[in-house]
Swiss-Prot record:
GO terms for molecular function: identical protein binding; semaphorin receptor activity. This is Plexin-A2. It is a single-pass type I membrane protein. Its main location: membrane. Belongs to the plexin family. It comes from Mus musculus. Residues 1259-1894 are cytoplasmic. InterPro entries: Ig-like_fold, Ig_E-set, IPT_dom, Plexin, Plexin-A2_sema, Plexin_cytoplasmic_RasGAP_dom, Plexin_RBD, Plexin_repeat. GO terms for cellular component: collagen-containing extracellular matrix; plasma membrane.
């Protein structure tokens, strides 16, 4: 019986979990270049995280242990089986667990954490141990995860109730032909009495054995187990042993553990005080007594840093270099381990971590030495945690060899000397978390995972390099840590890497990312070599003919290089022979082509490694840009064998004539020569006219040589003499020399005279320039001859023009001028001139050479410091004119306000500035001017200032702020009087200087230094110059701010998203800022102080120049805070802050302008709109239509904007995270009102129509008689046809029934792919919306979450008030702007919000329906119209009410016949041809989808290779030879994955169909390729017949390749066509929206080619739109409709019978139906409606037409399936028949009636009888009391209360309250009950509460 219970549980879990699972293939990891596609498997539930992973070493199957699930996956991570392990009702305190005996503890639904997952290979089973029921295990069959046994009835079966993964490890040991042993170590969480920490257990081959998991040995004296003593727990309350890894090697089993150290006699009760040690534990395999237990600490060090906290480990073989370093063989085992630094904080280890290696031989040697020393009696056993005290080693003469397994003495044995490993690699940033290793080509390759989701690839070489990281790839987009378990695929091409929510298959190498030989072979990746002639980096086994010489380069020295002679030629040199030598070349005998960039390609002549090529001809020579003298391009060699360019070098074309000067010509990099007499540069020296005129060295060039500075006063006539070299003598007919000067843009040409080859003189001339603001102007000049032949000026000699008077208005400034200008002061004219321009008789001319020269008439123009303290020390700056020509003239002659002021030599500026320092003032001195003398105090040398200098006494009043952080950096403001006086100020906090920042007359600002005396107050003192200001002020140093938490821990690359920072003392920071550093660049953003514990910040951008649009998640190199001077937070380590890519938006339309109707939603499509972050925070979008915001709903790929009521054209702007996008504009076109002429025309037309109607009525009477006769005749015709096809129907039905039985043979009801309740409800309530806000937690931007939640809880009270809710709904329905869509939305939101209170929701619904009936009858509408359409909130609420309450009935009863009908339709349609273009089929219930031609076809059986295991039997698949390749792929996928939900299958578009002919030949079949037949402008899709595929052919579905064998040459045409028809079969992500996807392929109008399959579209072109429905259907087509109808009849009958029956396989009628029908009857009685037709119609409109028709037409609402267009058309016919069956009106049929009505004309009367009987049976059932109904509703509420987020639903409903607040408040104020309950006030209070945050 128990076994049967296990079996049922396993099968149920298996099927149900697979149905519920959602698997996606995502772009995930990013290598160093690009974004490779990795196979990925995702967690089905965000909270059910992955724990363990293992790969079967023979089959390659991947097994994943997770919370509540164990999965079996294929090698490419597609799911095969999901085995349910939880959640279950449990309590950790129940011991024994409740599965053995009842438990009195409170039970809760508890997750089952997978803690152990091991494959028992010899018995083909999987051991999976969890945390439920005290840690019981299951043995699962590897093939299907069927439970073989779940031992749980003995205490030995309870391993540990610890619900944390990564604390347990197990090792299976088995000898040939014997039962196995399971060594298992686990943490026990203080329950040492219940669970041993280490044990050895039996693992019998028979799963039913009673000894399963028993201890190997268990007696009163000795057992195969070790328990933690209670004394140890008393001493260290948090003591536990965590088992990180285990393995068997040789005759031993090893465990690697982390455990707290146990200090001698000192109790430790705080986990934070613990020191941890990592230990190796060794046991002999065959030691049941555990006498061989030895435990030694282990770890490693580098550069003095100890790494002692074990994180992960992996046992592997060493590569050759590593084996040599360890002095071991390559066959021995090496342990690779990851450690974190130190011994503290094991549960939050530091980022500083290391990869270390330990040879097992070295570990065993150290253990042997420890054993030997102990058996020699040396020291203690050193295992205090287990023994409780120091126990001396016992001396015993026992020989101890390598296989010693202990005695009953000296055991268990510990040690304190650690086993030290070899440190291969360390990192201080991104903590290492996992490790795996294997040997490739003699190298140890180690793969290390990190906490940010990156995978490091390290080549372990041993000393001296240790381990070299050669690549790092980002595996997990969200930055999740890589978990401990990693495993290789069986072919070692892939590594399986796991995070908490994702498993990813990563290739072990990505050689293809390297594009050059140098990159490839310097990458350090041992997998990679250079495949020479294929010009690619790859593994050796991927390179063709790699064994041949130089075909595959394994070291960088083997890279090919190309030498070319000559390596450059002139552009005028054409078709030259070039000699190329290829170094390290493979055999090139198959031919070489030489390519000159993209200019030309020529044949090369090969001779060994030498190639002769011809340079380009005249037409192909490149054009060299005007400003360059050469142009380089790639000279490439292309292999004719591979077609690839395999080596290249730069080749240059040069142009000598680009050089205009001799020096640049002869100094160029090319062979250029200068023709001196022709003044040109040429590559051919023979073109020079004179032999002596040829120059090819710079020394021979004509050129000017340096001379003394050329100074010319403006206006002076002077010659300019220049030195030169090699000046040419002008030849006959050539002009002479000139000097050309460019002065302020004007060119002056002056004749020049050549004296000889080394001298030339510009003739006498004067020069001028404008302006007195320039005293000295450097002028460019050149010497030319023969008009424009320029002499080189290599030193860039210039002529300097100058004016003495410019900028020298005073005597002092004049005499201060540089002596070389020879300027002086002309006293009489008071100006600066040359001596010759000053009349010597009337006025003296002063210059530096004059004796004792002094300038008279000094003047003071300004004093800069005009006040200071009387104590002196103030520096006064004096500006003026003629303030001396030497410091000695003013050194003792300055007084300020009567006080001597000492000039400072270093600050003196001749004639312009004096800076002096004030002396001490006599008491009583108040103010005065500055007085000074120049040299002597005569009147002409004396002056005084107009400004007064004042003595003041500074004072201090207050300080702000009065406290700051200990690290300093606070801006301190000191206020007082006269604090701006003096020239310098100093502020001291205690004995430290406060760094001066700025001051005004009444305040000083300075920056506080770090405290030198710790925390507490310090005195504040101020000094101004020499004055000390008394003060009693104090400044207090307090603790530096600390940051505890950042929420959320993500942003987007542009930043500016809100962050909330929580911590301590945050208010002491004046200008807090947040910073990130990425790629060496820092970015900062602002923060605002909220209070002492909270800051709000805007996230910084990643970097200012970060490229947008990259779909990568980045982690900044540094993240921290700029908090004054607090250095500890500059880099904040306790965060995993990541950046998601920026959102991007597509244009609204190609033109950028979208035409909209008023009220229509605007859909903005984009990418990365919802970052996949945990925690609920979302991006805050604001969308503006013009200046008006709109309501926004966001999903991953689109943003829905409910626009305001606007007309005209408006720009759309999207604001998010500091970015602004404009995807275009919307043009809203309002429906214009009718004009007067239009109204008159309508009235006239109406009158005419009335007359026509009267005439038609008369004619109708006459016609109806004829119709009766026609109907009888037509009915007879149908009967005859039906009898003729009866036999065909029986045969077809029998065949279909066989197929359906095959399809459903292993489908019991639990196997039907039902959607889960939440998905089902969402598709009914909110069709087409995948990610609705009600599915997730409420998200509020900023820090308003609590306020909004509080307000919404107030709103919940209002919603739960019936008076309010009814008033709210009625008010909304009265508003004209409250659209039909709004009504449906509000109804669905209310039902989701009241999901937890269905009793109340039902009460409200009944009241609304009652109101609706009243209103319907008051308006004199026909009663039968009630509930016909969804025009009120009540009607949509009724649909949703039934959807909630009939879900169980759907799953238990109605779902099965509906699913069978769907399967039957799909199977029957696919038995005949289906046109891939038009969607028409041979077998159809719909005339519109019927092929109207005779199509010849044949059924084939194809044998398909099993895609998951090519060695398993082939799968036979029925197809038609006229099927397109895509149709064949769909049928194969249906056959291979017949029991797999549609969303979890591969897509046909992602697969290629291979036709396998023999063992080698494989042909890829495609809908279009180069063999596709094209006739005129028609192109026919390829079919199996086209490829001549025969019966029983072998085919295979393989993942689509990037390139194919037979892609057509006309790629542009075919690609368009293919994409169009591919999309018709593509699964779009959600299994069909409301509108079915019609597989119509639009002909390729752009290219003029039309695509067809079975029927050309123009075959029906002559039929007008309405003809099909109205014409008589010809017999042959009607026969097919009848045949299909007859074949499917049983399935339609089964469905209708189930829906119209009150008894279903023992299940009672759903209470909801009886309850609602009784309510409608009560309403009819209340209104005295006794017409049975009206009551019948109400019930039909209420349930069958409102709910069941929707489900029949859309089975994808209930099941995880794909509904094709032909299936959709047939279901629509069935749904119409269902509707007709519920109608009370008589169906009058004629020849013009639709074919589907004619088709079921005979059946509808009997169906109507079923309906009437059904309604009558329900009426006879006993009434349901309100009490019973409420109990049922309460139970339903409890079951699904958590499916939707109530606060989110309320928030959505509130948007309508906000929109119609005035109308709602008005309605509440008018309602008496609402007034009594003050509801209007409560609504106003709610609006105020919500508006605080908005």
């Amino acid at each position: 019986m128990e076994q049967r219970r296990f079996y049922l549980r396993a099968m149920q879990a298996d099927n149900l979990s697979v149905v519920l699972l959602s698997v996606a293939w995502l772009l995930l990891a990013r290598g160093t270049t690009g974004m490779p596609q990795y196979s990925t498997f995702h967690s089905e539930n965000r909270d059910w995280t992955f724990n363990h992973l293992t790969v079967h070493r023979r089959t390659g199957a991947v097994y994943v242990g997770a919370i509540n699930r164990v999965y079996k996956l294929t090698g490419n991570l597609t799911i095969q089986v999901a085995h349910k392990t939880g959640p279950e009702e449990d309590n950790k305190a129940c011991y024994p667990p409740l599965i053995v005996q009842p438990c009195s503890e409170v039970l809760t639904l508890t997750n089952n954490v997978n803690k152990l997952l091991i494959i028992d290979y010899s018995e083909n089973r999987l051991l999976a141990c969890g945390s439920l029921y005290q840690g019981v295990c299951k043995l699962l069959r590897l093939d299907d995860l069927f439970i073989l046994v779940e031992p749980s009835h003995k205490k030995e079966h309870y391993l540990s109730s610890v619900n944390k993964t990564g604390t347990m490890y197990g090792v299976i040991v088995r000898s040939e032909g014997e039962d196995g042993k399971l060594f298992i170590g686990t943490a026990v969480d203080g329950k040492q009495d219940y669970f041993p920490t280490l044990s050895s257990r039996k693992l019998p081959r028979d799963p039913e054995s009673s000894a399963m998991l028993d201890y190997e040995l268990h007696s009163d004296f000795v057992s195969s187990l070790i328990k933690i003593p209670s004394d140890t727990l008393a001493l260290v309350s948090h003591f536990d042993i965590f088992y990180i890894y285990g393995f068997a090697s040789g005759g031993f089993v090893y465990f690697l553990t982390v455990q707290p150290e146990t200090p001698d006699g000192m109790a430790i009760n705080s986990a934070g005080d613990l020191f941890y040690t990592s230990r190796i534990v060794r046991l002999c395999k065959d030691d049941p007594k555990f006498h061989s237990y030895v435990s030694l600490p282990f770890g490693c060090t580098r550069a003095g840093v100890e790494y002692r906290l074990l994180q992960a480990a992996y046992l592997a073989k060493p590569g050759e270099a590593l084996a040599q370093a360890f002095n071991i063989s390559s066959d021995e085992d090496v342990l690779f381990a990851i450690f974190s630094k130190g011994q503290k904080q094991y549960h939050h280890p530091p980022d500083d971590s290391a990869l270390c290696a330990f040879p097992i031989r070295a570990i065993n040697l150290q253990i042997k030495e420890r054993l030997q020393s102990c058996y020699h009696g040396e020291g203690n056993l050193e295992l205090n945690w287990l023994l409780g005290k120091d126990v001396q080693c016992t001396k015993a003469p026992v020989p101890i060899d390598d296989n010693f397994c202990g005695l009953d003495i000296n055991q268990p044995l510990g040690g304190s000397t650690p086993v030290e490993g070899l440190t291969l690699y360390t990192t201080s940033r991104d903590r290492l978390t996992s490790v795996a290793s294997y040997v490739y080509n003699g190298y140890s390759v180690v793969f290390v995972g990190t906490k940010s989701g990156k995978l490091k690839k390290i080549r372990a070489d041993g000393p001296p390099h240790g381990g070299v990281q050669y690549e790092m790839v980002s595996v997990f987009k969200d930055g999740s840590p890589i978990l401990r378990d990693m495993a290789f695929s069986i072919n070692q091409l892939y590594l399986y890497v796991m995070s908490e929510r994702q498993v990813t298959r990563v290739p072990v190498e990505s050689c293809e990312q390297y594009t050059t030989c140098g990159e490839c072979l310097s990458s350090g990746d041992p997998h990679c070599g250079w495949c020479a002639l294929h010009n690619m980096c790859s593994r050796r086994d991927k390179c063709q003919r790699a064994w041949e010489a130089n075909r595959f380069a394994a070291s960088i020295s083997q890279c090919m290089s190309l030498e070319v002679h000559p390596n450059s030629i002139s552009v005028s040199d054409h078709s030259r022979l070039l000699s190329l030598v290829v170094n390290d070349a493979p055999n090139l005998s198959e031919g070489i082509a030489c390519a000159f960039g993209n200019l030309t390609e020529v044949e090369g002549q090969v001779s060994g490694s030498q190639v002769i090529c011809i340079s380009p001809g005249p037409k192909d020579v490149p054009v060299i840009p005007l400003d360059q003298d050469w142009f380089g391009l790639e000279l490439q060699l292309r292999s004719k064998e591979t077609g690839k360019i395999f080596v290249s070098t730069e080749f240059k074309f040069y142009n000598c004539s680009a050089h205009q000067l001799c020096l640049s010509c002869v100094n160029s990099a090319f062979r250029c020569h200068w023709c001196k007499y022709r003044n040109l540069c040429t590559h051919d020296p023979t073109t020079c006219s004179f032999q002596e005129g040829r120059i090819n060295v710079s020394e021979d060039c004509p050129q000017l040589v340096p001379t003394e500075e050329i100074l010319i006063p403006v206006g002076e006539v002077k010659p300019i003499t220049l030195k030169a070299r090699n000046l040419p003598q002008p030849q006959s007919g050539q002009r002479g020399y000139e000097c050309v000067l460019s002065i302020q843009g004007a060119v002056h040409r002056v004749p020049a005279l050549r004296f000889n080859s080394s001298s030339v003189q510009c003739q006498n001339s004067s020069y001028q320039y404008d302006g007195m603001d320039i005293s000295n102007l450097a002028v460019d000049f050149a010497v030319v001859w023969n008009g424009n032949f320029i002499i080189d000026n290599p030193q860039d000699l210039k002529v300097h023009l100058y004016k003495c008077a410019a900028q020298r208005e005073s005597c002092g400034l004049c005499l201060k001028a540089d002596h070389k200008f020879e300027c002086g002061w002309c006293s009489g004219e008071r100006r600066c001139t040359l001596h010759q321009h000053c009349p010597s008789t009337s006025s003296p001319w002063l210059d530096w050479s004059s004796h004792n020269v002094k300038c008279s008439n000094p003047q003071i123009t300004e004093i800069l410091t005009v006040s200071g303290p009387p104590e002196g020390g103030t520096r006064v700056t004096i500006h003026g004119v003629n303030l001396g020509l030497d410091f000695s003239e003013i050194a003792h002659h300055v007084q300020v306000a009567g006080v001597p002021c000492t000039p400072i030599p270093g600050e003196y500026i001749i004639a312009e500035q004096i800076v002096c320092e004030m002396g001490h003032a006599v008491i009583g001195t108040t103010s005065g001017p500055v007085r000074l003398c120049i040299g002597e105090c005569k009147p002409e040398f004396m002056t005084k200032s107009h400004q007064q200098y004042t003595f003041v006494n500074p004072s201090v009043l207050s300080l702000s702020p009065i406290r700051g952080p200990e690290s300093g950096g606070t801006m301190v403001t000191i206020t007082g009087h006269y604090l701006g006086a003096g020239s310098s100020v100093a502020v001291y906090l205690g004995n430290q200087t406060c760094e001066f920042y700025g001051r005004s007359m009444n305040e000083i600002v300075c920056v506080s230094p770090p405290s030198s005396n710790g925390l507490g107050p310090v005195p504040v003192s101020v000094s101004v110059d020499r004055a000390r200001v008394d003060s009693s002020l104090q400044f207090e140093y307090i603790d530096d701010p600390r940051v505890q938490r950042i929420e959320p821990e993500w942003s987007i690359t542009s930043g500016h998203t809100p962050l909330t920072i929580t911590g301590f003392n945050l208010d002491v920071i004046q200008e807090p800022r947040v910073r990130v550093k990425f790629n060496g660049k820092e970015s900062v953003n602002v923060c605002t102080v909220v209070n002492t514990t909270t800051l709000t910040c805007l996230a910084p951008s990643l970097t200012s120049d970060y490229r947008p649009g990259l779909d990568t998640v980045e982690r900044p190199d540094e993240f921290g805070f700029l908090f004054n001077n607090v250095q500890s937070l500059l880099i904040y380590n306790d965060t995993k802050f990541i950046y998601y890519p920026n959102p991007t938006f597509e244009l609204l339309s190609p033109t950028g302008i979208l035409d909209q109707k008023p009220g229509s939603p605007i859909i903005l499509k984009g990418k990365n709109l919802c970052p996949p972050a945990s925690g609920g925070a979302k991006l805050n979008y604001t969308v503006m239509i013009g200046e008006t915001p709109c309501t926004v709903t966001v999903s991953e790929t689109q943003l829905l904007c409910e626009p305001p009521n606007l007309t005209g054209q408006h720009k759309v702007m999207v604001h998010v995270g500091g970015m602004v996008f404009s995807p275009g504009s919307v043009s809203v076109i309002s429906d214009s009102l009718l004009t007067l002429p239009a109204i008159i025309s309508i009235a006239a037309g109406g009158s005419l129509l009335l007359i026509i109607v009267i005439i038609v009525l008369i004619a109708y009477k006459r016609k109806s008689r004829e119709n009766d006769l026609t109907l009888k005749r037509l009915q007879m015709q149908m009967d005859n046809l039906e009898s003729r096809v009866a036999l065909e129907c029986k045969e077809a039905f029998a065949e279909l029934q066989t197929d359906i039985n095959e399809l459903t043979s292993d489908l019991d009801r639990s196997g039907i792919p039902y959607l889960d309740y939440r998905t089902y409800a969402m598709r009914v309530l909110f069709p087409g919306i995948e990610d609705h806000p009600v599915l997730r937690e409420l998200e509020v931007q900023g820090n308003g979450q609590q306020h909004v939640e509080k307000a919404l809880k107030l709103f919940a009270q209002l919603i739960n008030n019936k008076v309010f809710l009814l008033t709210f709904i009625r008010t909304l329905e009265l508003q004209r702007s409250f659209s039909m869509r709004d009504r449906g939305n509000v109804a669905s939101l209310i039902m989701t919000g009241l999901q937890g209170r269905l009793e109340y929701a039902t009460d409200v619904l009944k009241q609304l329906l009652s109101d609706l009936i009243d209103k319907n009858l008051e308006n004199k509408n026909h009663p039968k119209l009630l509930l016909r359409r969804t025009e009120s909130v009540a009607e949509k609420m009724l649909t949703n009410w039934f959807a909630f309450l009939l879900h169980k009935f759907l799953k238990e009863c109605a779902g099965e016949p509906l699913f069978m009908l769907y399967c039957a339709i799909k199977q029957q349609m696919e038995k005949g041809p289906i046109d891939a273009i038009t969607g028409e089929a041979r077998y159809s219930l719909s005339e519109d989808k019927l092929i109207r031609q005779q199509i010849e076809y044949k059924t084939l059986i194809l044998n398909c290779v099993n895609p998951d295991n090519e060695n398993s039997p082939e799968i036979p698949v029925k197809v038609l030879n006229c099927d397109t390749i895509t149709q064949v792929k769909e049928k194969i996928l249906d056959a291979v994955y017949k029991n797999v939900p549609y969303s979890q299958r591969p897509r046909a578009v992602d697969m290629d169909l291979e036709w396998r002919q023999g063992r080698i030949a494989r042909v890829v079949l495609q809908d279009e390729d180069i063999t596709t037949k094209i006739e005129g402008d028609w192109k026919r899709l390829n079919t199996l017949m086209h490829y001549q595929v025969s019966d029983r052919s072998v085919v295979a579905l393989v993942p689509k390749q990037t390139s194919s064998y037979n892609i057509p040459a006309s790629a542009s045409i075919s690609r368009t066509s293919i994409s169009r028809y591919d999309s018709s079969f593509r699964y779009t992500g959600s299994p069909d929206s409301l509108r079915s996807r019609v597989p119509m392929i639009t002909p390729d109008l752009e290219s003029g080619v039309k695509v067809w399959h079975l029927v050309k579209n123009h075959d029906h072109g002559d039929q007008k739109e309405g003809d099909r429905g109205s014409k008589m259907v010809s017999e042959i087509y009607l026969t097919r409709l009848l045949a299909t109808k007859g074949t499917l009849q049983k399935f339609v009958d089964d469905l209708f019978e189930t829906l119209f029956s009150t008894v279903h396989r023992g299940s009672a009628l759903p209470l909801a139906i009886k309850y609602m029908f009784d309510f409608l009857d009560e309403q009819a009685d209340r209104h005295s409606i006794h017409d049975t037709d009206v009551r019948h119609t109400w019930k039909s409109n209420c349930l069958p037409l409102r709910f069941w028709v929707n489900v029949i037409k859309n089975p994808q609402f209930v099941f995880d399936i794909h509904k094709g267009s032909i299936t959709d058309a047939c279901l629509s016919v069935v749904a119409q028949t269902f509707m007709d069956s519920c109608s009370t009106s008589e169906h009058r049929l004629g020849k013009d009636s639709p074919s589907n009505k004619l088709l079921y004309a005979k059946d509808i009367p009997s169906y109507k009888n079923w309906v009437e009987r059904y309604y009558a049976d329900i009426a006879k059932l006993p009434a349901i009391s309100d009490q019973d109904m409420n109990a049922y509703l309460a139970e339903q509420s409890r079951l699904h209360a958590t499916e939707f987020n109530m606060l989110s639903a309320l928030n959505e409903i509130y948007s309508y309250v906000s929109k119609y607040s005035e109308e709602l408040i008005g309605a509440l104020e008018q309602d008496e009950q609402a007034r009594r309950q003050r509801l209007a006030y409560k609504v106003e209070h709610l609006i105020n509460a919500m508006s605080i945050e908005s």
